[in-house]
Amino acid sequence: MHASLQLGYTNEISAEYLSHMDDCYFKEQQPSSFIDEKRAYVKAHPPIAIYRVATEGSQTRDGGVVQQGTLRMVFTLDSGQQVCAARKGDLVVYADGRTAQIVTTAGEANSHIALVGSRLGNGDEIINTPQEGFLLFTREGVPMAEDFLPALTLAEVQLPSSDVTMEGVR
């Protein structure tokens, strides 16, 4: 497990942060008709939520840690440490040695990259990530892909025993 305690970033953000998500899209060198078209889209579909990318060192609600991200996307943390993005199938390790696989992600169109909010095969969920900068976001009125963080089905959850029910599973 990682020896140093990293600051974990969640998907919790302020309304002000969301309101500035599109600021970088409007460059003066772009044609004004293009800018007007983008502004109309942004006004009609403002950002409503973010999903940070999970990496090595991301933590779960039940105390697990992503040990090795296998997606070839590398982030340099504030500490200078480099971590890889996690994806579907990567393992989360718990202090007692148990492991669980990441089973829900941003979907095929996003290379099955794991996110804060991704679920594991044991019903656990990734709750934070040590990287701050790379995220996906949703817009009002714009549906996400069907395979973007889908709800788990009972068949996808590895139950510890037959008499246990999992919260949040349909």
Predicted regions span which residues?
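Intrinsically disordered, low-complexity proline/glycine-rich segments
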Residues: 1-170
